[in-house]
A protein has these predicted regions:
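Conserved C-terminal helix/tail region of periplasmic/extracytoplasmic solute-binding proteins
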Residues: 2-3, 171-172, 177, 376-423
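Short, solvent-exposed loop/beta-turn-alpha elements that line the ligand-binding surface or hinge
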Residues: 49, 125-137, 180-182, 202, ...
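Extracytoplasmic/periplasmic substrate-binding proteins
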Residues: 58, 241-324
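Extracytoplasmic "Venus flytrap"/periplasmic binding protein-like
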Residues: 71-139, 172-174, 274-275
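Helix-loop-helix "hinge/cap" segment bordering the ligand-binding cleft or interdomain interface
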Residues: 146-210, 221-258, 320-326, 405-408
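Long, aromatic- and glycine/proline-rich binding clefts that accommodate carbohydrate-like moieties
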Residues: 345-393
Length: 423
């Protein structure tokens, strides 16, 4: 069922300057470590020793750095090991250099969009099956970090997309809770109703990281579940792009650049957009930069195939060449326990990747219900190696969707993806 409407003046979690990065950078950690060592029967029981673990993270700010450091130090104190936390300035570059130089960190943040590249070249230790209660992680997140039928690593946390609506614009248009859009047709109707001379009904990012949600709602995606079949030019994807093209032509949908904004959250906060589609990271940006704006967060409307959203996540990667694999697995087990994930949520606002932690999270952040719901049905990034340049080219096509041909845009994606994946 569609989540009920909520109004919120959100608590501070993330600044607008890091809003884009926050969707892809978060950790499991916190300040409450009440369990006795090994109390849950997890791998930490057998991790005693004197291993020195290097941990590379991409932090969203001081709160995240402090949380992951405190959690790792607590594990080290319990097990007799040592840890060194390195906060990367550019984690993609530093991780690549570490592997290329034969000196990767033992444990590290690994973005879902880059996971397949590292899994394919043998850089990762496939440890996921050694984590207790692995099935407790949301199934779509587990699939995101599965390559060639092997689950490699466990997600630290995750974000999803939802529909944000300004309550002042909603009420000024005479709309009520009964008008919350639950279908594409209803979204088109309210977007048109909310479009005025100075405000666009809906403003969303002009890349696959927002538009892709509509492809999922139509029953499509770039590749099939097997990770090897390219499905870009499917009728379902064409239907999604045609729908959005219609809204762009009607003027009820615009991209941020069309309203002199850097991203959807800025257009939303300044009132240039009545609605936007962003992740739960928007909460901090709104609080920090637009504290007087009341808004609602609801699940994305269903498409022809039903519900659909996108998931953004990172896993705790472990280097295949680590000399302390056993201890690294123990650390990851510790960091991803329910109490640690809830402590991380309290410290800097990330959503737990374990289903059993969702109730506790919603007690802290009830207004995030729409985002949490996406954990059950969200779509992760394209899970195939070598696709980054192909997807960037797809983004370029999407940016020209208003004047472009959906079939041509998808056809180009199909041929480019097949060339990489080897179809």
């Amino acid at each position: 069922m569609h989540q009920p409407l909520t109004r919120t003046r959100q608590l501070t979690m993330f600044g607008i300057a890091t809003a884009a990065a926050v969707a892809l950078s978060a950790c499991g950690g916190g300040s409450s470590f009440d369990e006795e060592p090994g109390a849950s029967g997890d791998p930490s029981e057998d991790a005693g020793g004197t291993a020195a673990l290097d941990i590379l993270i991409a932090s969203s700010g001081d709160a995240e750095t402090a949380a992951v450091t405190e959690a790792a130090d607590a594990w080290a104190a319990e097990t007799g090991n040592t840890v060194e936390i390195v906060v990367a300035q550019d984690i993609a570059q530093q991780l690549s250099q570490g592997f290329a130089g034969g000196n990767p960190p033992d444990v590290f943040y690994l973005d879902a969009a880059r996971f397949a590249d590292y899994a394919a070249n043998g850089s990762l230790e496939p440890y996921a099956d050694q984590i207790e209660d692995f099935e407790d992680f949301y199934e779509p997140l587990r699939q995101t970090f599965t390559f060639e039928e092997t689950a490699y690593c466990v997600p630290k946390d995750f974000s999803t997309l939802a529909l944000e609506i300004r309550t002042d614009s909603w009420e000024a248009a005479g709309l009520t809770d009964a008008d919350i859009p639950t279908t594409w047709d209803e979204l088109a109707d309210v977007a048109q109703t909310l479009t005025t001379g100075e405000q666009t009904g809906l403003v969303i990012g002009d890349t696959r990281d927002r538009i892709g949600a509509f492809m999922v709602q139509a029953g499509g995606w770039v590749i099939g579940d097997d990770g090897t079949t390219v499905t870009a030019d499917s009728p379902e994807n064409a239907e999604a792009l045609a729908y959005l093209k219609g809204l762009l032509e009607a003027g009820s949908l615009k991209y941020p650049s069309q309203v002199d904004s850097g991203w959807g959250g800025e257009a939303f906060g300044t009132g240039k957009a009545a609605m936007t589609i962003e992740g739960n990271w928007i909460r901090g940006a709104m609080t920090n930069d637009y504290p007087d704006v009341d808004y609602m967060a609801v699940e994305l409307p269903e498409g022809p195939a039903g519900k659909g959203t996108l998931q953004f996540t990172q896993c705790w990667g472990i280097a295949a060449d680590s000399d302390a694999t056993e201890q690294a697995i123990s650390l990851v087990q510790y960091l991803t326990e329910v109490d640690q994930q809830l402590a991380a949520a309290e410290a800097f606002g990330v959503m737990p990747s374990r289903e059993s932690a969702s109730a506790g999270y919603l007690e802290q952040f009830p207004d995030d219900a729409a985002f949490v719901a996406g954990g059950e049905y969200g779509q992760g990034p394209v899970n195939a190696p070598g696709m980054e340049s192909v997807l960037l080219d797809f983004d370029t096509g999407l940016q020209q969707l208003a004047s472009g041909d959906p079939a041509q845009i998808l056809g180009t994606l199909q041929s480019n993806a097949e060339a990489v994946i080897g179809q």
